[in-house]
């Protein structure tokens, strides 16, 4: 039952997600592609977590943050992808009102945690390159745990903020969501409440949050680049810069998509374009991060070789 009639007011109890396409053949193709990407995402990020856990040489702050980034990537992808895969195989792509809120809050939680973790990793690189002699002191286990805990608290606050707005909206119909998951923007379009003030508050908050965390990342890299330029040897500069390229690539991909979806004016792009970029943000980035950090990191590649070598000896 999609609606409850309460006197003169109709309340929506479930929503229909329109998804990516109505074409049955294309649905099957997308199901196969997205399922493969999701399985690789889970395998890649889980392998990263396990490799860091069993390799003593990877028990450093940078890899501590990386293991949490991998778990957050799995959570972000898992908050949307399983439901999307089920909807590819069913004719009526419905999700309950409560399920929609849970999906939205999960995506908001993991998305915000990733912001803070990327900022923490930028600080880690700043200390490692600009203050190497004080690295063990400034990036102690206690500091790392506090930074990660702060990231999860920030994610919880963001999820609470977004969830509060969602459950404060009234939905009287229609109930067809023009997206593949319950994102806040298409949900506001369906609300029969006056969302004009909420839309301004949410847009301002999203823009401020994104640009503030980006600023926190840019400032450390400004000092990092100055320090790298002062290194006389070409080999030294390349080695110092190589430790930052993976993180910079991840930051560029993540912030580029977030700014497009949540910061740029809605009039500058269509809903279909928003779906494509959201798919990249929810599905492609989580599968790319393990590749970005492993292919450009000799320590991870060496640790992986050691694990394979040990298994061949057993």
From Swiss-Prot:
Residues annotated as glycosylated? 6
This protein is called what?
Answer: Olfactory receptor 5P62
Q: List locations, semicolon-separated.
A: Cell membrane
What molecular function does GO assign, one term?
Answer: olfactory receptor activity
Q: Which InterPro entries does the entry mention? A: GPCR_Rhodpsn, GPCR_Rhodpsn_7TM, Olfact_rcpt
Task: Extract one GO cellular component term from the record.
Answer: plasma membrane
Q: Which residues lie on this side of the membrane: Cytoplasmic?
A: 50-57, 124-136, 221-240, 296-314
Q: Is Ligase one of the keywords UniProt gives this record?
A: no
Upper classification of the organism: Eukaryota, Metazoa, Chordata, Craniata, Vertebrata
Q: Which domain of life is it from?
A: Eukaryota
Pfam families registered for this protein in UniProt: 7tm_4
PROSITE patterns, from UniProt?
G_PROTEIN_RECEP_F1_2
Which protein family is named in the record?
A: Belongs to the G-protein coupled receptor 1 family.
Q: How does it sit in the membrane?
A: Multi-pass membrane protein
Q: What gene codes for this chain? A: Or5p62
Entry keyword set: Cell membrane, Disulfide bond, G-protein coupled receptor, Glycoprotein, Membrane, Olfaction, Receptor, Sensory transduction, Transducer, Transmembrane, Transmembrane helix
Q: Which GO terms describe its biological process?
A: G protein-coupled receptor signaling pathway; sensory perception of smell
Segments spanning the bilayer are 29-49, 58-78, 103-123, 137-157, 200-220, 241-261, 275-295
- Is the keyword Cell membrane assigned to this protein? yes
Q: What is its main location?
A: membrane
Q: What does this protein do?
A: Potential odorant receptor.
Disulfide linkage: 100-192
């Amino acid at each position: 039952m999609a609606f409850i009639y309460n006197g003169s007011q109709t309340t929506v109890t479930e929503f229909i997600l329109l998804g990516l396409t109505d074409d049955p053949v294309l649905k099957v193709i997308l199901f196969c592609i997205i399922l493969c990407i999701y399985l690789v995402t889970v395998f890649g990020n889980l392998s990263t977590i396990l490799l860091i856990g069993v390799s003593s040489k990877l028990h450093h702050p940078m890899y501590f943050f990386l293991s949490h980034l991998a778990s957050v990537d799995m959570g972000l992808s898992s908050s949307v992808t399983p439901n999307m895969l089920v909807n590819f195989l069913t004719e009526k792509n419905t999700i309950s009102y409560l399920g929609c809120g849970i999906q939205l809050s999960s995506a908001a939680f993991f998305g915000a945690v990733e912001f803070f973790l990327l900022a923490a990793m930028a600080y880690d690189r700043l200390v490692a390159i600009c203050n190497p002699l004080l690295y063990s002191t400034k990036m102690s286990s206690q500091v790392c745990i506090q930074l990660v805990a702060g990231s999860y608290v920030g994610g919880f606050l963001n999820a609470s903020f977004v969830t509060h707005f969602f459950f404060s909206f009234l939905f009287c119909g229609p109930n067809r969501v023009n997206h593949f998951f319950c994102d806040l923007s298409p949900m506001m379009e369906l609300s029969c409440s006056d969302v004009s003030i909420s839309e301004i508050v949410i847009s301002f908050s999203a823009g401020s949050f994104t640009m503030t965390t980006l600023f926190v990342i840019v400032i450390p890299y400004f000092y990092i680049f100055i320090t790298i330029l002062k290194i006389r040897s070409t080999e030294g500069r390349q080695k110092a810069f190589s430790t930052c390229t993976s993180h910079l690539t991840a930051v560029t991909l993540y912030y580029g998509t977030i700014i497009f979806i949540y910061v740029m004016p809605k009039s500058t792009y269509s809903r279909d374009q928003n779906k494509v970029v959201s798919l990249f943000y929810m599905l492609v980035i989580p599968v790319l991060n393990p590749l970005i950090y492993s292919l450009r990191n000799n320590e991870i590649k060496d640790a992986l070789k050691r694990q394979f070598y040990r298994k061949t000896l057993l």
